[in-house]
A protein has these predicted regions:
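Acidic/charged, solvent-exposed loop-and-adjacent secondary-structure segments enriched in E/D, K/R, S/T
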Residues: 87, 116, 168-213
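Gly/Pro-enriched, hydrophobic low-complexity segments
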Residues: 41-49, 54-58, 151-153, 162, ...
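Compositionally biased, proline/threonine/alanine/serine-rich low-complexity intrinsically disordered stretches
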Residues: 36-90
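Bacterial N-terminal signal peptides
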Residues: 19-30
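N-terminal short leaders/motifs
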Residues: 86-106, 185-193, 215-233, 243-244
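N-terminal secretory signal peptides that target proteins for export/translocation
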Residues: 1-15
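N-terminal mature ectodomain segment of secretory-pathway/periplasmic proteins
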Residues: 87-180
Length: 312
């Protein structure tokens, strides 16, 4: 489980002054709906003293579209990251119910071609993977193309795979790590070799998968009367803080993806940096972290097994 971040109240006054400033700036902007990413960064406004109630009220009173604009600018400028734990929790409790889901949707729209690293642990065939897999991933959303390398400090080190739906939507090309890495072969994306390592296919490696999963589950949460997360907290993930939202379902699986799910929002970018899920016995069955997420423009060699950088 992710460690709880330590909260300091030392910067509370300055933090809420910044919060009030950003709220005032956002309220003054005229932005077309759905184009928050295109809006100019608002100029700062001086704000006196500790304006905790005022700042939160200003942000929470904005319509959803303006809250998304505000959140986008606060993340990009680093203001969101500079708020302390208590301020972050209070802020996200005050936002409109639809703001979080609409905000992370902007991340899926923006991050369509990117490189990242991921740490993953899963319960596969009833057994928990005690050592995380640490992978470098190069990902293109459309057409779906994925290159993955298992890094030296994680499980299955040295393994590589490439998936290109243009060549074959049902198979991937891979080689194992270690002394067996001389042999490369085609395998079904949901075949036995893949399922021995993961409950997910290569098509489910991107941050968009976890966003889409959250959006689908959110509809089911609300249909079941679960209107808001049971807990909002600030946790640490690989040296970075996340705002973590825990959702608990009345019946669990198979009606829902998990009995309990916790998603950690990145403070700089509009996506979930972490995802954890528990089964009906409240045993953790998967844990994912995404780090070093960087927008890229890939050429065709990135998804070609003949790339001299690779060892196929």
């Amino acid at each position: 489980m992710l460690p709880v971040a330590k909260t300091s109240i030392k910067s509370r006054v300055a933090g809420f002054a910044r919060l009030a400033s950003l709220a005032l700036a956002s309220a003054a902007m005229i932005v077309a709906p759905g184009h928050a990413e295109d809006a100019p960064t608002p100029a700062g406004h001086p704000a006196p003293g500790d304006q905790s109630p005022v700042a939160i009220t200003q942000v929470s009173s904005l319509p959803v579209e303006r809250q998304i604009v505000w959140l986008t600018h606060a993340a990009r400028s680093g203001e969101l990251e500079r708020l302390d734990d208590a301020q972050l929790i209070e802020l996200f409790r005050a936002l409109a119910p639809d703001t979080l889901s609409r905000y992370v949707q902007t991340g899926s729209a923006r991050y369509r071609e990117y490189e990242f690293q991921t740490f993953s642990q899963q319960r596969v065939k009833g057994r928990w993977q005690t050592k995380p897999a640490h992978m470098l991933v190069r990902y293109r959303q459309e057409p779906r193309q994925v290159y993955v390398k298992w890094l030296a400090d994680g499980r299955n080190a040295g393994q590589e795979m490439i998936y290109d739906e243009k060549k074959d939507p049902d198979q991937l090309y891979a080689h194992p790590g270690g002394i067996l890495n001389l042999a490369s072969f085609w395998v079904p994306i949901d075949g036995a070799r893949v399922k021995a390592q993961s409950n997910h296919t290569v098509r489910e490696l991107g941050i968009d998968y976890f966003t889409d999963l959250f959006l689908d589950e959110l509809k089911k949460y609300r249909a079941a009367g679960v209107e808001k997360p049971s807990q909002i907290e600030v946790l640490n993930d690989h040296g970075a803080r996340v705002v973590a939202f825990t959702w608990e379902t009345p019946t669990g699986r198979p009606d829902f993806y998990a009995k309990k799910e916790r998603l950690g929002l990145d403070l700089r970018q509009p996506f979930f940096r972490t995802s954890e899920a528990w089964d009906n016995d409240l045993e953790l069955f998967e844990k994912f972290s995404f780090t070093d997420v960087t927008l890229k423009r890939f050429d065709d060699s990135v998804f070609d097994s003949k790339n001299p950088e690779y060892r196929f």
